[in-house]
């Protein structure tokens, strides 16, 4: 089975990897990494379809759920945890599950990825339903945990998609949409945390960012739903208001505080010269889209 996966093949360019100088190793890695974005480009049309179903889930108050094992699971969790501070989502809107539970994020849990039923249990625990979208991530495209999750997701009517790094992946049989980014042989044979992991991260970035744009979390190219959870983000919020409105830093700061640190509301207040309450009403009527509120 493994010998049929391109991610498990030996890379002809790095047969003498153990004899290379440090610089040669780094140059080889860099050369291989340059091929990843091109491999992702080949899947843009399928990624677009995935974004459409995720956006639909969000519009219907559904959720985006990532499932994976090992590096794939960690990448899903990484994308999920960045959504609340970046886009102002609640913790449930985008979630990530890894085979073996959160403890597997820092330490491998032996055998967890081989059990289909664990994914079913994880998805059952959050009350997965037909409004949700489940995306299974597996570089090999054959992880039982991911297959089990996709099977269960389909059984409850949830939308499904898969991300793998091999063509004709096994998991593609269990999802409606399938992103198969063929990254090929790694410089270190079978180490799919390298090119395959990079490809998965790029695809996840695309899916979450484009979906959030689709539900009004972005104005122009500004992340106007940013949550001010630390000093850096407070300053970023004020700068976003300045960029969006052309107001002075002082005016932006004043409106930011008047708007209870709601960046969108502060922008509307300045551009429409209205009070906080009116700004909130306009945003509500525009379903959170700043451009429509204006």
Swiss-Prot record:
CDD domains: SIS_Etherase
Chain ranges of the SIS domain: 54-217
Active site residues per record: 82, 113
Domain of life: Bacteria
Cited Gene3D superfamilies: 1.10.8.1080, Glucose-6-phosphate isomerase like protein, domain 1
Known pathway: Amino-sugar metabolism; N-acetylmuramate degradation
DNA repair among keywords: no
Reaction equations catalysed: N-acetyl-D-muramate 6-phosphate + H2O = N-acetyl-D-glucosamine 6-phosphate + (R)-lactate
Family matches, as Pfam families: GKRP_SIS_N
GO biological process: amino sugar catabolic process; N-acetylmuramic acid catabolic process; peptidoglycan turnover
E.C. numbers: 4.2.1.126
Keyword set, alphabetical order: Carbohydrate metabolism, Lyase
Entry's Gene Ontology molecular function annotations: carbohydrate derivative binding; carbon-oxygen lyase activity; ether hydrolase activity
SUPFAM superfamilies on file: SIS domain
InterPro entries: Etherase_MurQ (IPR005488), Glucokinase_regulatory_CS (IPR005486), MURQ/GCKR (IPR040190), SIS_dom (IPR001347), SIS_dom_sf (IPR046348)
Name of the top EC class for this enzyme: lyase
Keyword Chaperone: no
Family: Belongs to the GCKR-like family. MurNAc-6-P etherase subfamily.
Function: Specifically catalyzes the cleavage of the D-lactyl ether substituent of MurNAc 6-phosphate, producing GlcNAc 6-phosphate and D-lactate.
Quaternary structure note: Homodimer.
Note in the entry: A lyase-type mechanism (elimination/hydration) is suggested for the cleavage of the lactyl ether bond of MurNAc 6-phosphate, with the formation of an alpha,beta-unsaturated aldehyde intermediate with (E)-stereochemistry, followed by the syn addition of water to give product.
Descriptive protein name: N-acetylmuramic acid 6-phosphate etherase
